[in-house]
Amino acid sequence: MLLTLPDILSPQDLQAARQLLIDAPWADGRDSAGAQARQVKNNAQLPHDCEAARAIGTMVVGGLERSALFLTAALPKKIFTPRINRYSGAANHYGNHVDSAIRTMAGSGQRVRTDVSCTVFLSEPDDYEGGELTIADTYGEQRIKLPAGHAVLYPGTSLHQVQPVTRGQRLACFFWVESLVRGNEQRRLLFDMDMALMQLRQEHGESQATVALTGAYHNLLRMWADT
């Protein structure tokens, strides 16, 4: 399931994030990549424990917690510490790859299964050329380039890449979610069911039918969830 999440960051959040990034200590993004990813990764990335990365990560997680769409789509159990990257100049692309299945959070050593990937855009589309997040799915190749503050969710199993940035700079926050429901097909079914229930309630109010369907939703979640 590929899903756009609008306005995860407010204009005030974005202004604060950009101010934090002015003097940020950028490092080679390949330093945090595995052996295979190193061969295709060419960008800059903030150390996870620097002030700018921590502050922006806190803003992003706060925005996610306020997003009903994120909560129902991702069904989050754990959120990997958000990272910040930059594509510009010679360090301007990330070739085709699939994210590692398990990531370990620095400091705590806690492991996170990467069921869902998420990118929050920090730059406006007009600020740079190229830089599309390109995701291969069952419907073909999807090219994603969203307004600043918007996010995209997609399965962690997806083959994806970031196209070369040929002008300007592309700033983004990225992270992974371990879901209560690890299977993409099951998450999609639960998401579709929840969205349909919301629409039924808006159009017809609560009824015996919506109560029964809500029960079915929770019984499926109970069957599939890993807490």
UniProtKB/Swiss-Prot annotation:
Enzyme Commission code(s) on record: 1.14.11.-
Gene Ontology terms for molecular function: 2-oxoglutarate-dependent dioxygenase activity; iron ion binding; L-ascorbic acid binding
Cofactor comment: Binds 1 Fe(2+) ion per subunit.
Gene Ontology BP terms: DNA damage response; intracellular iron ion homeostasis
Binding site residues for Fe cation: H97, D99, H160
Sites where the protein binds 2-oxoglutarate: R170
The keyword Cell cycle is annotated on this UniProt entry: no
Highest taxon in the source lineage: Bacteria
Keyword ATP-binding: no
Entry keywords, A to Z: Dioxygenase, Iron, Metal-binding, Oxidoreductase, Vitamin C
Required co-factors: Fe(2+); L-ascorbate
Residues annotated as domain Fe2OG dioxygenase: 78-179
InterPro entries in the record: Oxoglu/Fe-dep_dioxygenase_dom, PKHD_C, PKHD_hydroxylase, Pro_4_hyd_alph, Pro_4_hyd_alph_FE2OG_OXY
Alphabetized NCBIfam families for the sequence: PRK05467.1-3, PRK05467.1-4
UniProt protein name: PKHD-type hydroxylase Bpro_3048
Organism: Polaromonas sp. (strain JS666 / ATCC BAA-500)
Organism lineage: Bacteria, Pseudomonadati, Pseudomonadota, Betaproteobacteria, Burkholderiales
